[in-house]
Amino acid sequence: MLQLSSSLEKNLAALNARFGASADFYAKRIELYHCPGAIVLFDNMASLESLWSLLLDAATRHTPSLEPERMPHTGTQVYDLLMNHSGLPAEDGPVKDMDDLIRRMTAGMAVLLLDGCKKGLVFSVQGLKSRSVEEPSGEGNLRGSREGFADLLRVNLSLLRRLIRTDTLVMETAQADCAMKTEYAICYCKDKASKTAVARVRRTLQEAKPEGLLDSSYFVPWLFPARWRLFAPVNYTERPASAAAKLCEGKIVILVNGSPSALVLPSLFCENFDCLDDYATTAVFSSFLRVLKYGSFYLSIFLPGVFVCLAVYLPELIPPQLLFKIAAAEKATPLPLFAEMLLVIILLEIIREAGLRMPQTLGHSVSLVAALIIGDAAIGAGLLSTPVILVASITASSVFVTPSLYEPATLLRLGVTLAAGLAGPVGLVCAALGVLAALTSISAMGVPYLSGAVFSGDGVVRRNYRALSRRPFTIWQRRGS
């Protein structure tokens, strides 16, 4: 670690060697109390207007009142005057080494270096341009806060602090060990979160060495190192209100600078089926919606496989009138039912991906038009049958009821359809048992992934909110349940 030198020229030479070729590097030589100095910062990250206003105000306010014998003559004396005897809003911790200096500058701060002083004075004059606080597009709700996380870490931390206004909320910041040196924060309530879990998360993130850190999801492979895991015991939210609710349950929230997505851990399987609106409606209607979500999730996984299994291997279980229509439709198509279903599933994923990656103003229209044209043309040309298109459409609609489970649901749907098409009822049963085994084998920091779905009072069926409030709940109470 390179310590700052008492020579201003050496410090500037070290900075110029690193950032001299960068157009945004700003270094301005000044003189304070007849002492040579320099202001260093990155342009457009720190506000030059605010900085010069602070320095000029300090110089004009304090210089006339100083007696000649108290006038500073060395860099150390000037530093002491500005730090301890002026009204400058400087940061408490001085800069003593080059790595810390660069970290402060890349955070949008300005640093004053003085000749003859081995410390730098830091000013928080950030002038970063960023996206304002907006409503997140991926988490719709009817009631409650409309605010969403922004891209700046400090803004997101302030949103959480505004919601949890107690001394129990702890927000630890650190810098990732990667080339980008991205700042992240670990947030938890010290009276509810498990100290062991917090220590484990802190240690894991310190030891993690990603190539770059652009989102909180980059930490998941280090927190839960499983190579072939479909379900991860984590969740994501872009709503400060949702993150605050999870913190009050004893969970840990990880925020990364530059990303509005907060990583919540540990997370349970049943939490993919609830939302903030569940607690703003009656318990009966909330329970109905949750049952509907569970049904939609399993429908999105098993419906194509069950349809292929019944139509190909067990046609006697289908009502005769429906069976005759399916047989007539399949007779007019050149592909077998199994291949037809796989083709439609893959086509729908291609259309969805195309709509997602296109500009927002065109994405929805392109997806809708492409689905209608391809479906109508395929049926008209006799390439695909109407029952297959109908089953695939129901499946595609069902998967969006639980967007947080979209990725595993898509892969499992393909796997179940393959198993049902190749091995019939045996393959379908084996696939269902495989899904169940995958879910039961997951443990979220000692808490079973499937816990709380039935007997917790806030699982598939929810009790009324008053009854839930009478017994404070944290996720660590489910350990080993």
PLM features: residue spans?
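Membrane-embedded alpha-helical signal segments
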Residues: 1-302, 316, 320, 440-481
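Flexible domain-boundary/linker segments
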Residues: 32, 57, 118, 177, ...
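Amphipathic alpha-helical protein-protein interaction surfaces
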Residues: 165, 331, 424-425
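Transmembrane alpha-helical segments that form the functional core of multipass membrane systems
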Residues: 254, 267-415
